[in-house]
Amino acid sequence: MPQFRAKARAVDLLGKGQISDLPTAISELWKNGYDAYGDALEAYIYLSGYENIKKPLFILQDDAKGMSRKDILEKWIVLGTDSKTRNEIDIKGEDTLWKEPRIKMGEKGIGRLSVAYLGSPMLMLTKKKNEPLQILYFDWRTLENYNLFLEDVNIPIASVISSEDFKDKFKKIRIDFLDNFNSRKEIVDGKEVIIDFWQEQFLLKDTII
C-alpha cells in the first residue's frame, strides 16, 4: 500500500519557513532551553581572526537538563514530537532539575529546526545527569539536495566518556557524516543498481565538503 514519503529538503523548508530572522531563531532555541529548565541562556559570535578562528563561529548554550542518547533518537531528531501538543504537565523532580514546573514556550516539535538558520555545519553537545556526553554533527545544507529522502540522510551521534575521548569521537562522527555523499547500491526492478544522489548536485556538495 502506498505511503507518504518526505524529501529531505522538507525539513529545511519547514525550519526556515518558521523563522523570519536571526533573532527569532535564537529566541526559539532559547525557548526550548527554558522549557528544559535552563536559566543561563547565552549566545556568542566570534568573527574570523579572533583567537586564530578561521571562520565565523556561533555558540548557543544553556544550563538546561540536557539530553541522553535515547532523548536525541526518540525526540530531537523526530519531527513533531507531541509532548507540548498534548499539554503534558511536568512534575517537580529530577527531570525539572527540582524547579517548579514551567509553562512551555517553544514551538510544538519544530522549534529545534531553528538551529538550521544559524549556519552550517553544526556540532551539538548535550549531557543529561548520570549520562555520558552526547555529540552530534550535521550540515544542514545537506537537506537542500532535492534527490534525498529523509531516510537517506545520516546524522552521526557519539557518546563521549572523557575529555581524551572527545577528539577521537569528534573525528569519527565527521567521517561518518561523509557517508551521506557516497554512492549506494539499491535493488530496482529486481536488479542491483548504483545510486548517486549527488551526481546532479556537485556544486552543493563542494560547498559542504
Label every model-predicted segment.
Residues 1-209:
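GHKL (Bergerat-fold) ATPase N-terminal catalytic module, capturing the glycine-rich phosphate-binding loop
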